């Protein structure tokens, strides 16, 4: 099952493969060689408008976590099923589930070969401290490779195959793309652990570890940094999308990825000119700059040199998410080096002596606070007062780090939250943590400490502002905005805020969801939810009138 070798990356003709087999050129994009260290990238061969759909992609192989109760074929969980239907477990391995006979039939070609092996994986992989998902991914990768080899041998006269290539280890397609990936094994700090696992994996398949373990290790190190977590699926499902692997990273990408379970839809989030490279974001969309750079280095093994990072590096930008309240500006204040001081001084003092030039160099390193919106520069005492506001974030982080069951929503916490919302800019990543935590506060036992008026003035407006600003305006993720707001609609309905929930859902369905053709959402379910909210709202009004009378 395990291949005898891996194709030489230098011999692969990937640009031709992407063009001829996958029709990238017909989609308005093509694979090209890049300048510098990036190797290859995806470029546009025509102009794209904002919000334009480029392509849909399915994973080559995928996997879910051990013991996850989710359909192994379509990734539906029990909440996604129609009433009366359940997920049924494979009677043999008792590890994978299916939601229907149709899904089980689709998966059978691969599962019939992996079933016996999967049942022995837990006892093997737990000892090696390797994620079971990676084990399953490897197993399915090799099974699918063998199936493709059989198909190639049976159809070697077909024009779509690689001209009767007699090398039974050669497959022209997505598997070949995987062969061409870098493994970064020279800079991996955990190689010994993976080597141990690779030997165990060979033994599991009844193959000679001495011969095949290096091959397994090679693929394992290729898979880990190149698998994509599939959002909105239970138990952190992961997928390997070979056709996605040559989209390079930018912290300010020009395309976005929308998922409908396994399927990924690539859309533009800005106007893209012809011959412009297309970028996606490998790191979490909302995180502090140092966390973003550390994540890229640790998980993807490169120092980011995108335009955003180079610009931040040039001005020595530091994470600072404080709101500019001058004349109700509302812009974000950032901490940086004033690179203009040195230029201005040089223009005014061209005839100065060396000592003056040294002074100018010292001045050029002056740190300033600058509003990105109104361009006001804060210095001296004003700057010191602004920097003191960082304590607000620190104090709130300390509060949020406390176990949510033990936090009392007292006046101190509410005052701190109000101060945070007033002084800290909505793009601050901590807003996400606040939303998640306060949702537990307000829906848990502690909600008795909060009146309806306080609930609407503190929690709900900030939730909406944070989501709308961050996900819609900053990241241009219309889909993600809809998903988050639908979660919010359910939260409002749970707490009997039927009118608010009804207004938001009506706006979503009329505007935002219609813009993405309800992609990834069930229109009938949303119409049913809309009807139920209307019904609950009318009943709520009738009940209120009876109480008043």
From Swiss-Prot:
Enzyme class, top EC level, equals transferase
Q: What sequence ranges are listed for the domain SET?
A: 27-283
EC number per UniProt: 2.1.1.-
Pfam families reported for this sequence: SET, zf-MYND
According to its UniProt entry, the protein's GO biological process terms are: methylation
Where Zn(2+) 2 binds, per the record, is at 90, 93, 111, 115
Gene3D superfamilies from the UniProt entry? 1.10.220.160, 6.10.140.2220, SET domain
| Molecular function, one GO term | methyltransferase activity
Q: Where are the zinc fingers (MYND-type)?
A: 71-115
Which residue positions does the secretion signal occupy? none
Q: Which residues bind Zn(2+) 1?
A: 71, 74, 99, 103
Sorted alphabetically, the keyword list is: Coiled coil, Metal-binding, Methyltransferase, S-adenosyl-L-methionine, Transferase, Zinc, Zinc-finger
Q: Which CDD domains match?
A: SET_SMYD
In the UniProt record, does the keyword Signal occur? no
State the InterPro entries in the record: H3K4_H4K5_MeTrfase, SET_dom, SET_dom_sf, Znf_MYND
| GO annotations of cellular component type | nucleus
- Which residue windows are coiled coil? 340-401
The similarity annotation says: Belongs to the class V-like SAM-binding methyltransferase superfamily.
Q: What does this protein do?
A: Probable methyltransferase.
Q: What is the protein named?
A: SET and MYND domain-containing protein DDB_G0277331
């Amino acid at each position: 099952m395990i291949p005898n070798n891996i194709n030489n990356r230098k011999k692969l003709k990937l640009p031709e493969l992407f063009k001829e087999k996958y029709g990238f050129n017909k989609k308005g994009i093509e694979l090209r060689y890049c300048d510098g260290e990036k190797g290859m990238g995806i470029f546009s061969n025509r102009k794209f408008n904002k919000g334009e759909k480029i392509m849909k992609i399915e994973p080559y192989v995928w996997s879910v976590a051990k013991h996850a109760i989710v359909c192994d074929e379509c990734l539906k969980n029990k909440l996604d099923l129609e009433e009366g239907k359940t997920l049924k477990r494979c009677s043999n391995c008792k590890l994978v589930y299916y939601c229907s006979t149709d899904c089980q039939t689709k998966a059978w070609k691969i599962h019939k070969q992996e079933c016996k092996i999967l049942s022995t994986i837990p006892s093997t992989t737990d000892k090696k401290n390797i994620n079971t998902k990676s084990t399953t991914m490897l197993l399915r990768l090799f099974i699918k490779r063998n199936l493709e080899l059989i198909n190639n041998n049976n159809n070697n006269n077909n024009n779509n195959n690689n001209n009767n290539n007699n090398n039974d280890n050669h497959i022209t397609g997505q598997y070949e793309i995987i062969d061409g990936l870098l493994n970064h094994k020279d800079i991996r700090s955990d190689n010994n652990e993976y080597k141990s696992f690779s030997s165990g994996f060979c033994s599991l398949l009844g193959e000679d570890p001495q011969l095949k373990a290096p091959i397994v290790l090679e693929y394992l190190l290729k898979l880990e940094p190149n698998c994509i977590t599939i959002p909105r699926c239970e138990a952190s499902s992961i997928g390997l999308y070979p056709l996605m692997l040559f989209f390079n990273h930018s912290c300010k990408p020009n395309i976005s990825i929308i998922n409908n379970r396994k399927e990924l839809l690539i859309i533009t989030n800005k106007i893209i000119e012809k011959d412009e490279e297309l970028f996606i974001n490998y790191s979490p969309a909302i995180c502090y700059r140092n966390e973003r750079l550390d994540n890229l280095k640790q998980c993807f093994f490169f120092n980011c040199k995108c335009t955003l990072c180079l610009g931040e590096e040039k001005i020595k930008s530091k994470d600072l998410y404080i709101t500019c309240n001058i004349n109700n500006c509302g812009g974000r204040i950032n901490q940086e080096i004033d690179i203009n001081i040195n230029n201005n001084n040089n223009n005014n003092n061209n005839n100065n002596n060396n000592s003056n030039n040294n002074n100018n160099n010292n001045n050029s390193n002056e740190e300033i606070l600058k509003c990105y919106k109104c361009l006001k520069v804060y210095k001296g005492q004003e700057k010191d007062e602004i920097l003191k506001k960082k304590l607000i974030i620190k104090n709130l982080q300390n509060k949020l780090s406390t176990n949510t069951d033990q936090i009392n929503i007292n006046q101190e916490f509410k005052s701190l939250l109000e101060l945070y919302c007033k002084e800290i800019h909505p793009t601050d990543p901590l807003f996400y943590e606040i939303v998640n935590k306060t949702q537990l506060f307000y829906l848990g036992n502690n909600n008795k400490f909060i009146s309806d008026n306080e609930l609407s003035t503190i929690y709900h407006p900030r939730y909406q502002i944070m989501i709308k600003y961050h996900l819609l305006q900053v990241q241009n993720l219309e889909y993600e905005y809809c998903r988050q707001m639908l979660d919010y609609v359910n939260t409002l309905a749970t707490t009997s805020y039927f009118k608010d929930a009804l207004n938001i859902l009506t706006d979503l369905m009329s505007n935002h969801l219609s813009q993405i053709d309800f992609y990834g959402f069930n229109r009938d379910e949303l119409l049913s939810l809309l009807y139920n909210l209307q019904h609950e709202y009318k009943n709520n009004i009738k009940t209120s009138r009876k109480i008043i009378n």
